[in-house]
Amino acid sequence: MISFERNRAVAEQVCDLTGGDLIWYSESAFSDAFEYDAIIAIMSCGIAVRKIAPLLSSKWTDPAVVVVDCALRHAIALVGGHHGANEIATQLSVLGADPVITNASEVVK
């Protein structure tokens, strides 16, 4: 998980739930985190999109990416919905976040 230190309380809640590692945001945070199977980013979608765009190569090998706002209102499955992001976004509903899932195969069920 990647978070700004100002969102420490939310980051700790998410870490406690998921058991993931916490990486404080830095210029290299996303490239460092791309070795993981999934990344939860506690920040705006805009920041996450700009940081992951140059790192993406294949839907089959890229990590799942979920973006969570700092108020835990929304958990957005941004990349890799079928490779873990949808499941993680749904898991975060335990903390009150509404999962945002946009895969056509999931939406039309």
Question: Over which residues does each language-model region extend?
Answer:
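N-terminal basic/disordered segments at the start of proteins
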Residues: 1-26
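Short glycine-rich anion-binding loops that position phosphate/pyrophosphate groups of nucleotides
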Residues: 6-7, 44-48, 105-106
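Short amphipathic alpha-helical segments and helix-helix/interface helices
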Residues: 11-15, 53, 89
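General beta-strand structural signal in soluble alpha/beta enzymes
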Residues: 21-26, 41-43, 67-68, 98-103
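Glycine/small-residue-rich interface belts in oligomeric ring/scaffold proteins
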Residues: 28-84
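Residues on a specific face of well-ordered alpha-helices
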Residues: 50, 86-90, 94
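Internal, active-site/partner-interface "lid" segment
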Residues: 68-79, 95-109
